[in-house]
Amino acid sequence: MTSNDPADPADRAEFDDAAVAGMTSEAEAGATAEGVEDVPAGVRERYADLVEQVRAHQFRYYVLDSPTISDGEFDELFTELQTLESDHPALRDPDSPTQVVGGTFSTDFTAVDHLERMLSLDNAFDPDELRAWVERVEREVGSSAHYLCELKIDGLAINLLYRDGKLERALTRGDGRTGEDVTLNVRTMDDVPDQLTGTDEYPVPALVEIRGEVFFRVDEFAQLNASLVEAGKPPFANPRNSAAGSLRQKDPRVTKSRPLRMICHGLGKREGFEPKQQSESYAALRAWGLRVSPHTKVLSTVDEVLEHIDYWGKHRNSAEHEIDGVVVKVDEVSLQRRLGATSRAPRWSIAYKYPPEQATTRLLDIQVAVGRTGRVTPYAVMEPVKVAGSTVARATLHNADQVRHKGVLIGDRVVIRKAGDVIPEVLGPVVDVRDGSEREFVMPTECPDCGTALAHQKEGDVDLRCPNSHNCIGQRRERLFQLAGRKAFDIEVLGYEGVSALLSAGVVFDEGDLFDLNEEALLKTTLFRTDDGSLSVNGGKLLANLESAKQQPLWRVLVALSIRHVGPIAARVLAREFGSLDRIQEASEEELAAGEGVGPTIATAVREWFDVDWHREIVRKWSEAGVRMADERDESIERHLTGLSIVVTGSLEGFSRDEAKELIMARGGRAAGSVSKKTAFVVVGESPGSKYDKAVQMKVPVLDEDGFRVLLEQGPEAAAEAALPAE
């Protein structure tokens, strides 16, 4: 089935939508409604035969990759099926291969519980960690095991519920216990049958939850982006995020227009089917009409597993989809049961994560950007290149000294990597391919935004800064953008475009004016007003967000002030120690530096910030506008965590990460970001990552969420008794 074939999932949406429109108009034009019993028997028989044939050929094409008819022959069958449904609307039912959800589309994404919890996976990052996991497994079960290895797809986890073979519900993973109902959208995907098939060996079970991953194929994602660019629309950043966004569309027709795929990799709750091996469950999934990865392999030793992992590490770009590792599972289900699970992950499975990818590309230019504190940072402009699952075209170069240190020239071929698979970094040039056309980067002497001469803030400082902090539009824009972020006032609708609109219209000069905004001011901007001159929906949301932001805790206000070196951690300490902005402003450097984790550098920065007249004017304006400048202290809270360093990792159900840190600090503790010998406890939620592994290795007490509550309410001695057993 070629990409030009209407039966191909990449192109079928438009074809089906046209058919639906035709069927709707004919049904509406009919004088009387035709019932199924009114359809001639021969037509009903032909329709049933076509449905069966189309399903079978889709199964052979999409699942078995072994079609038995040509693309043209399949197209004829599919078109005939559509024609019969158009001529006889009564024949249409939800199980038809041509099903398109018609009328007014609405997906509310209702929260629904999974029948069986969807756990996350522990990770291994090197061969020694994987060997240690295998040793633990075989020590626990008292014998050797077989290991099923499969590619770790970088997609969106999904849970399908089939009852008597019929798709009843599709949920996103959510928090593992509860997911979002995306059934209408999932029904539009060709890889997800409405009705399971079955064989004598593997009949369809009475009930089964099927877990899998929704993704874009690499080539189809590229085609999708090319079509978007051709249409004058911005391309998607990476396949994983665009797959998630495509599946969560409110209009299922949009989802259907995207070439989403799904590969199944496990079962949840089931009735009427008990496999003996994980690999047997995959054979059953294939028999039921679902896709399973063709790259799954069962191996007997850890050396074989590592060899398999090494192979895919070298060939990860040859898979049809993005991968970020290999999942290793104990194949025997009886051993899986004996191994059990922790509160967050099965003990019988682990994900081996690959290190960040590297790639080479052309360095087209080096430009500079001005930050919120005036720092002028050079960044690389490159030919777009695929690295670690996303397309990279820019990367920071930090400062002019780093450019010289790396030895990169404009026009070079450069090696880049994504540190932590997130932040693009230029490692250095490929010197051997230089042809003499390359040129050195010259750091500008003037601010690119306001023209002010750049200078070092102090002797020995490697960074150049624009000293025009109050009037430089670049700095004002960055400060406003930063204060709206999640770690400051968390003003949802005030993004970069909104900040630029406010500055361009002149309704704010700097951050001091932000909380004086009203409807009259927003109507002066094109972004926050409608074509008829009224306030837009986002304009109304912005005013509501600003009102809510006035009640944010003191530490967020401190972050929003853009005081150099003061991030969320230092801000929390200052807020906890002093309680109000007035007391912070009145404190000496020595008093400020006394807070744990503050020190002289931050204390000096705070003192110098308050010495500037226009900085104090911002505080005055915010205070007069009603921004909360002091925290209410609960004197009843015992400070029984004083002096203790506590690390929180993973997702907690009852607390956000910020809330957990605030509760720790309110009791005198330090919310640390890494595990060390000084760590008193590590609190783990879902997907805790390497911090949990390090805690186990260093024998630091580990608390689950219940243990964390004990720590908060009863103190460290009681929490030590509630710690999870050492693995």
Swiss-Prot record:
Catalytic reactions on record: NAD(+) + (deoxyribonucleotide)n-3'-hydroxyl + 5'-phospho-(deoxyribonucleotide)m = (deoxyribonucleotide)n+m + AMP + beta-nicotinamide D-nucleotide
Bilayer-spanning residue ranges: none
Molecular functions (GO terms): DNA ligase (NAD+) activity; metal ion binding
Binding-site list for NAD(+): D71, G72, E73, F74, D75, S120, L121, E150, R173, E213, K329, K353
Active-site residues annotated for this sequence: K152
Residues involved in Zn(2+) binding: C447, C450, C466, C472
Pfam families named in the record: BRCT (PF00533), DNA_ligase_aden (PF01653), DNA_ligase_OB (PF03120), DNA_ligase_ZBD (PF03119), HHH_2 (PF12826), Nlig-Ia (PF22745)
UniProt GO BP: DNA repair; DNA replication
Keyword Lipoprotein set for record: no
Domain (BRCT): residue spans on this chain: 636-725
Keywords for this protein: DNA damage, DNA repair, DNA replication, Ligase, Magnesium, Manganese, Metal-binding, NAD, Zinc
E.C. code: 6.5.1.2
HAMAP family linked to this entry: DNA_ligase_A
Role summary: DNA ligase that catalyzes the formation of phosphodiester linkages between 5'-phosphoryl and 3'-hydroxyl groups in double-stranded DNA using NAD as a coenzyme and as the energy source for the reaction. It is essential for DNA replication and repair of damaged DNA.
Protein's name according to its UniProt entry: DNA ligase
